[in-house]
């Protein structure tokens, strides 16, 4: 089973994944972008830009990472439990300047149509996101601000709705304001 955690920065994806590592010791834990050696280099380029990158070039770099991630991680472990911190869904949401049909086609190509079966979508409100952003050093994407993140979160919801019409997926939407213990319990039940 391929499971992905989706949500904007600071909603607790990493915290919940860490809790699952204690339970699913044989699972494959990964992340996008940056789940491979190539991906780490691309992630560095994308998050710490030293020069401007066009939106189209940025999209193609993320797709290159995704294709490599599929080859190295997803394809070789497709018969195991795979839990990923983000996926192509975030890629579609962050690429807000492009149409969903185009993004879906490009991601389908990069992933050879290998999609997650279950999606855990953690949602945060403006206050929660602002509070958590203020507690960390920001990368170039995080520096775009709270309004940017809320617009991405809105786009994530729209992408999930779009994907329900395209592929067979189960989606669990959770309020990130809940305690990490309560969220963990709901996630465990969803994964059974």
UniProtKB/Swiss-Prot annotation:
Name of the protein described by the UniProt record: Thymidylate kinase
Enzyme class: transferase
Main function: Phosphorylation of dTMP to form dTDP in both de novo and salvage pathways of dTTP synthesis.
An annotated Gene Ontology molecular function: ATP binding
Keyword Ribosomal protein: no
Catalyzed reaction equations: dTMP + ATP = dTDP + ADP
Pfam families linked to this entry: Thymidylate_kin
Membership in a protein family: Belongs to the thymidylate kinase family.
GO cellular component: a single term: cytosol
EC id: 2.7.4.9
Keywords per UniProt: ATP-binding, Kinase, Nucleotide biosynthesis, Nucleotide-binding, Transferase
Binding site for ATP: 7-14
NCBIfam families in the cross-refs: DTMP_kinase
């Amino acid at each position: 089973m391929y499971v992905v955690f989706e949500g904007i920065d600071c909603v607790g994806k990493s915290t919940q994944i860490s809790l699952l590592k204690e339970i699913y010791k044989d699972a494959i834990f990964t992340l996008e972008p940056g789940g491979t050696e190539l991906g780490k280099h691309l992630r560095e380029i994308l998050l710490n830009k030293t020069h401007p990158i066009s939106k189209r070039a940025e999209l193609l770099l993320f797709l290159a990472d995704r294709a490599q991630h599929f080859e190295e991680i997803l394809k070789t472990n497709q018969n195991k439990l795979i839990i990923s911190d983000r996926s192509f869904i975030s890629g579609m949401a962050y690429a807000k300047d492009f149409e969903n049909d185009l993004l879906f086609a490009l991601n389908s190509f990069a992933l050879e149509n290998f999609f997650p079966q279950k999606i855990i979508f953690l949602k945060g409100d403006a206050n929660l996101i602002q509070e958590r952003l203020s507690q960390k050093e920001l990368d170039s994407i995080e520096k775009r601000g709270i309004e940017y993140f809320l617009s991405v979160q809105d786009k994530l919801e729209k992408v999930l709705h779009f994907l329900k019409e395209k592929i067979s997926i189960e989606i669990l939407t959770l309020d990130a304001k809940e305690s990490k213990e309560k969220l963990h319990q709901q996630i465990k039940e969803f994964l059974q």
